[in-house]
A protein has these predicted regions:
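C-terminal auxiliary extensions adjacent to catalytic cores
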Residues: 6-31, 35-42, 46-54, 80, ...
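Cysteine-centered functional microenvironments
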Residues: 142-147, 330-334
Length: 524
């Protein structure tokens, strides 16, 4: 729960109430974090139970045994600390470029949040140190690739945990420092790991959940931009507004479908460009629009419904105990299970990728319609500028090539990672989630979609320019103005690269999300 302290916004974590919005605020706005006192007491109770079980000489997986296929080897009591340090060192084996700071901050936040549930058997100093580093903006070096998503994100989280031991390295103010230097920045000494603490640190789903959560947040902004693009395109071709009538969507009762229709009605309210059966003759021109316009609520509705389902899954995961074994303080038990398994996240992120790919697919179809003189209702072929001659000038012909290339790439990336298990650890871990793969490809799919929607916005704005913008609706007028502040109309052929990049930045930063939100709020 966020608290204001002067200009600083401080977020309290308790292991149970973290939300997507709060995670994004910590990851990207650097909001400070504090741990709820009751949550710290839970960690103390959980640690006490583990220590009692060890005094009773109980055999506990990963605490006094080896790991994975080596779990049949018993470890002597005098070697339990070394076992945990060895685990983190040996499993810090990821490769590639380091994660961006927002992903790392999200990972740190999520790991601290799950540890304070009291089911991991760690001392409170561990999550407290993670939060201290987070608040100081000291970000451990975590390479992107190396996790199969079961047993959790072992390798990336091991890289994060090395810094707590004074090992590895971290980024601070855009320079790399050693693990020991990182700890000095927060006035701490290296942690000497006790029994189970290494396993508690690296056994969880925080990498895939962090990447997926940040991508989902950006996907909501993308979705609003796609609605803005659809509305502007609808006006640009002088399309029919009747398919968005509330009565049609009330008969099917899918919430996303109704939401999209509502948003488009709000965006084009007052439009003199859209046609309606009330005032226009269907015999005058085309009586129906192509599916990419007419069926947009039925196509985009399932996308936003899927995103909402993904959000629910991710927020459950944010507040879950995801390591193994788990301590149950009230019963005094320690049980081995599989909460580290990333299948719920993997399948959710595959679904998100599929939904986003669909969003881009239908956007590309509208781009094609806007450029096609047989479909764009009287505009020039490829929206050649007024001062140019079709044939001599190509207009926006080539932007569809780019959109098509991006959509084709997404069709490859939309293949589900969750269906591609490869056994690991001597076939002991014989079914893994590949959740990190689903997360990574969702990043690529998202960026491709942002570009495709940016291209549709560019194309629709040019079409509106050629037709005349005086009749735009209440919301689309603001969409058009936002584009025109960045990109001038196409009068004669020029490179469209810079234009696309400028609109891409508007999409990425949520400019159209703000327009749609304010509009719908005002309509309600």
């Amino acid at each position: 729960m966020p608290h204001s302290r002067g200009r600083l916004v401080e977020v309290t974590i308790d292991g149970s109430t973290l939300t997507l919005k709060t995670l994004v605020s910590v990851a990207r706005s650097n909001n400070a974090v504090r741990i709820d006192k009751k949550a710290l007491q839970r960690t103390i109770r959980g640690r006490a139970v583990l220590e009692k079980l060890l005094r009773d000489d109980k055999v506990i997986y990963g605490v006094n045994t080896g790991f994975g296929a080596l779990s049949n080897f018993k470890v002597a009591s005098g070697e339990l600390k070394q076992l945990q340090a060895n685990l983190l060192r040996s499993h810090a084996a990821s490769v590639g470029k380091p994660h961006t700071s927002d992903v790392i901050r999200a990972m740190m936040l999520l790991r601290a949040n799950t540890l304070i549930k009291g089911n991991s058997g760690i001392r409170p100093e561990i999550p407290q140190l993670i939060v201290a580093l987070l608040n100081k903006r000291v970000h451990p070096f975590i390479p992107q690739k190396g996790s199969v998503g079961a047993s959790g994100d072992l390798s990336p989280l091991s890289h994060m945990a090395l810094v707590l031991m004074g090992e590895g390295k971290a980024e601070y103010r855009e320079r790399w420092v050693s693990g020991k230097q990182a700890l000095r920045l927060v006035g701490r000494d290296p942690i000497q790991l006790e029994a189970k603490e290494g396993l508690a640190l690296n056994n969880g789903t925080q990498q895939m959940t962090s990447i997926g959560s940040l991508n989902l947040s950006d996907s909501y902004a993308l979705f609003a931009a796609s609605e803005a693009a659809l509305a502007l395109s609808l006006e640009a071709i002088r399309g029919w507004i009747d398919p968005f009538d509330e009565r049609i969507h009330r008969l099917r009762r899918h919430p996303g479908q109704a939401r999209v229709a509502r948003d488009i009605r709000a965006l084009v309210e007052g439009s003199k460009l859209c046609r309606t059966i009330i005032k226009d003759d269907p015999a005058d021109g085309r009586p129906q629009d192509p599916y990419s316009f007419r069926c947009a609520p039925q196509v985009l509705g399932p996308v936003i419904d899927a995103m909402d389902n993904v959000k629910s899954t991710l927020e459950i995961e944010m507040n879950s105990a995801t390591d193994n074994p788990l301590i149950f303080p009230n019963e005094g038990d320690c049980l081995s299970g599989g909460n580290f398994h990333g299948q719920p996240i993997s399948m959710a992120l595959d679904m998100m990728g599929l939904g986003l790919s669909t969003l881009a697919n239908i956007s590309e179809r509208r781009i094609s319609a806007l450029l096609d003189a047989s479909l764009n209702n009287g505009l020039t072929a490829f929206l050649v500028g007024r001062e140019s001659k079709p044939g001599l000038a190509s207009g926006l012909m080539a932007v569809q090539y780019t959109a098509t290339a991006l959509v084709a790439e997404n069709k490859i990336l939309a293949h589900p990672a969750s269906s591609d298990s490869i056994p690991t650890s001597g076939n002991f871990e014989d079914f893994v989630s590949m959740g990190p793969g689903a997360a990574h490809k969702s990043t690529s799919i998202l960026e491709n979609c942002q570009y495709v929607v940016a291209i549709e916005l560019l194309t629709a704005a040019q079409a509106v320019h050629l037709r005349g913008d005086a009749g735009l609706g209440r919301g689309t007028r603001n969409v058009y103005r936002a584009i025109r502040r960045e990109v001038r109309p196409l009068a004669e052929d020029r490179s469209s690269h810079d234009d696309i990049e400028r609109i891409f930045e508007l999409v990425r930063k949520g400019q159209f999300n703000d327009i749609v939100k304010q509009l719908v709020k005002g309509s309600n």
